Amino acid sequence: MLENLEKYKIILASNSPRRKELLSGLGIKYEVKTLPGIEETYPDTLKAEEIPLYIACEKAAAYRNTMHPDELIITADTIVWLDGVVMGKPHNEDDARQMLWKLSGKTHQVITGVCLTTVGAQRSFSAVTEVTFAELSDEEIDYYIRVYKPMDKAGSYGIQEWIGFIGVRGISGSYFNVMGLPVQRLYTELKKL
């Protein structure tokens, strides 16, 4: 379906198993290539929707000096936004527990920024999904952290895991965005290249 991409060697610049799964779901052939030590920092003046977009584009910038003319680099970043606060990946189990307590019984936003970069051009976009959690008990939170170890997930949860089944009361927007890659929007943007 995406014949226009045949001229590119597609590089997914992410170790996220969820992003790999989602990109594979589009039927796109790609390689994974990551660079160590890319800082995920941003200016304090950015709005919520700008933060993951800024970080995704900064990740892409790290590849500019090593890109080949036939490469298309896909970079992404996801944050959880609640009450004016960014929730990234937890630092430890206590941090994960605090995040899940804060999300319990509330609606938050999951925002993913995606950057598509070639030697000659760059296209970027972000997607926002609202997620409403039911009230979670301490036992449910502790069980989830102990069994699923969500240390690699923004907001300390994976919607596709147990906590999503028992705790997510509703979503508005892309389910796949909550997993880490808004694949429908990505497909649309890739068709434009």
Swiss-Prot record:
The keyword Hydrolase applies. GO terms for molecular function: dTTP diphosphatase activity; UTP diphosphatase activity. Keywords: Cytoplasm, Hydrolase, Nucleotide metabolism. The active site is at D77. The record marks R18, T78, Q160 as: Important for substrate specificity. It is found in: Cytoplasm. Its main location: cytoplasm. NCBIfam families: maf. This is dTTP/UTP pyrophosphatase. It comes from Phocaeicola vulgatus (strain ATCC 8482 / DSM 1447 / JCM 5826 / CCUG 4940 / NBRC 14291 / NCTC 11154). The lineage of its organism: Bacteria, Pseudomonadati, Bacteroidota, Bacteroidia, Bacteroidales.
